[in-house]
């Protein structure tokens, strides 16, 4: 039996709190446990044990939270703000290097690869076009 909540399919044997934490971006184990305790589900209740009103209560609870695309947009905006204000972590994002203090002498290849790729709409690299300005060259070289 498959249970559908907000367009996501859950197997019937899955534990509710683990299933919510694994399927929805922005919900971890702690948040999933809080949702279950708020709605009155016991800790290891499985998806196939839910009734239709309980499924609807989970859906209504999740619809009030910032999850999926909204949570990703917030992360993207935070990274863009760090770059814009010129913070150290923003600079590390721009240079495609590890942000959280990891060593880079040997093992930074993964961060370099992942920070260059457009991951779920978070693109970190842009190239500016350099244009020739004759008046600038005349000021520099005095011709």
UniProtKB/Swiss-Prot annotation:
Pfam families: Ribosomal_S13. Its main location: mitochondrion. One of its GO terms (molecular function) is RNA binding. Keywords: Mitochondrion, Ribonucleoprotein, Ribosomal protein. GO terms for biological process: mitochondrial translation. SUPFAM superfamilies: S13-like H2TH domain. GO terms for cellular component: mitochondrial inner membrane; mitochondrial small ribosomal subunit; mitochondrion; peroxisome; small ribosomal subunit. It is found in: Mitochondrion. It comes from the Eukaryota. Belongs to the universal ribosomal protein uS13 family. Present with 259 molecules/cell in log phase SD medium. Component of the mitochondrial ribosome (mitoribosome), a dedicated translation machinery responsible for the synthesis of mitochondrial genome-encoded proteins, including at least some of the essential transmembrane subunits of the mitochondrial respiratory chain. The mitoribosomes are attached to the mitochondrial inner membrane and translation products are cotranslationally integrated into the membrane. PANTHER family: 30S RIBOSOMAL PROTEIN S13/40S RIBOSOMAL PROTEIN S18 (PTHR10871), SMALL RIBOSOMAL SUBUNIT PROTEIN US13M (PTHR10871:SF1). Component of the mitochondrial small ribosomal subunit (mt-SSU). Mature yeast 74S mitochondrial ribosomes consist of a small (37S) and a large (54S) subunit. The 37S small subunit contains a 15S ribosomal RNA (15S mt-rRNA) and 34 different proteins. The 54S large subunit contains a 21S rRNA (21S mt-rRNA) and 46 different proteins. This is Small ribosomal subunit protein uS13m. It comes from Saccharomyces cerevisiae (strain ATCC 204508 / S288c) (Baker's yeast). The gene is SWS2.
């Amino acid at each position: 039996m498959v249970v559908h909540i907000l367009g996501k399919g859950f197997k019937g044997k899955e534990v509710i709190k683990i299933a919510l934490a694994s399927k929805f971006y922005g919900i971890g184990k702690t948040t999933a446990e809080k949702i279950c305790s708020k709605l009155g589900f016991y800790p290891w209740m499985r998806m196939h044990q839910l009734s239709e009103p309980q499924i609807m209560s989970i859906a209504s609870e999740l619809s009030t939270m910032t999850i999926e695309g909204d949570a990703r947009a917030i992360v993207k905006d935070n990274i863009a703000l760090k770059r814009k204000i010129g913070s150290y972590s923003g600079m590390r994002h721009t240079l495609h290097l590890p942000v959280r203090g990891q060593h880079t002498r040997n093992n930074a290849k993964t961060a370099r690869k992942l920070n260059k790729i457009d991951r779920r709409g978070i693109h970190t690299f842009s190239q500016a076009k350099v244009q020739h300005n004759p008046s600038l060259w005349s000021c520099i070289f005095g011709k």
